[in-house]
Amino acid sequence: MSIRSRWLMISVGLGILLNPLNSSMISVAIPRLQNVFHLDFTVVSWIIFSFYIASAIAQPIMGKASDLFGRRRIFLSGLVVSFVASLLAPLSPNFGWLIVFRIVQSVGTSMMVAVGMAIVRIHITEKQATALSMLSIFLSGAAAIGPFIGGVIIHLWGWPAIFLVNIPFVVTSFLVAWKHIPKDDPSTTSVSRNMSFRKWFELIDASGVLLFTVGLVALLVGLLSAKSSGQISFNNVIVGLIGFVGLGAFVRHELKAKAPFIPLRTFAKYPAMTWINVEFMIVNLLFYSLFFGLPSYLQIVRHVSEFHTGMLMLSLGLCSLIASPIAGSWIDKSGPWPALLMSGMLMTLGSVWIVTLDQTSPVISVCLALAAFGISNGLNSVAMQAALFRSSPKEIIGVASGIFNTSRYLGTILSSLLISIVMGDNFSFEGFRILGMILTLIALSLVFMNWRHKETGQLHES
């Protein structure tokens, strides 16, 4: 690999790690944000919802935009947007403005994730597989150590530091990318100059994006408002109904759209692939329920500092990183289903362990649940990808990958919703135990699904 290629890979890697890093660092900051802005957990959870909803929408749109405006231009623009958001978020006068800057940050980091892999595929031809695997390490590594980094810097410098820490990464990535990422081909980007707004809106399925956003946000607002107030009011019902109607209209629109935001017709055509995405959504629901729930439990219920919370969460990240390469060798020999079955069992074990904890249990014992979920996450990250490729025809693998990412975001959004509904305004030991019981039931259903996959052969190629 040439020196220029190495610098290109470094610039892309530093850019794309910002999305998983910022999505994971925030898990340790939630109790601090509750205290600073004097809000309950249900309201503060929008710091999670907003980021993932924005990412779910921005990444596919920016992927399409890069074909028209150029990948280098989108990547550099994403760095500028991320820089502005990271600089302004600590200056937020209230929580509403913090949510706005969090959404802007999500859009900026999503721009880089959407085009980063494509830049490497196009411009690095020598040892391309090695380069792509290195980028995967940037992504998974950032997500794994995010809570640890977040815990340390919040403990030392307060919550604004989790935004300011992005600036050195952004500046370095921008300077290196400006010099080493080749300029976009003018013939590729010239199409955008002659494209009307109407044609552009059709290309990105603006109507579908709007219906999806309005429906999902309205449904979440209706549910969480009812939970927060402790009663179901007329306004809650109206907002919830708007959400249901919006999502229903979204489904109807997507089935007819020429270039749908989420190609729902693909689900009916390829049922094996559909089940993989359903399972992936459940996997992320389980994993992120622990990932976002446990730091708040440790800090609010057990009074553990941010620093020590980050240290404990590191056991989850390290186990995940160690398990991934082992899973790769195992799956090459035995296929994905044994690894997925083992992952479901580990998630069940970790969930049961949460239920057995009491208020006198040593805090270090939480590491057992974290280790179980960490190993299962390492197995899932490889096995689910392998299962997707086996269940998806080669001619739609690009579409399948897009749906796969959407399933991850939906699972994460559902995890935050589950935590908010179970915990309500404040975290409690009883609520965390109930959460563990619910996760145990969901994990058992995952084990059953994987056992069925083994029996019916749904993980074999379509």
Language model regions located:
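Intrinsic disorder in cytosolic terminal tails and internal cytosolic loops
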Residues: 1-4, 186-200, 453-462
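Small-residue (Gly/Pro/Ala) motifs that create kinks and tight helix-helix packing interfaces
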Residues: 142-154, 158, 219, 415-423
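Hydrophobic transmembrane-helix bundles of small-molecule transporters
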Residues: 157-279
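12-transmembrane solute porter fold
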Residues: 5-21, 26-30, 37, 41, ...
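Helix-breaking motifs and short loop linkers at transmembrane-helix boundaries and internal kinks
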Residues: 38, 70, 91-97, 125, ...
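Cytoplasmic helix-loop-helix junction between adjacent transmembrane helices
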Residues: 105-137
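Conserved MFS/SLC helix-loop-helix module at the cytosolic interface between two early adjacent transmembrane helices
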Residues: 57-93
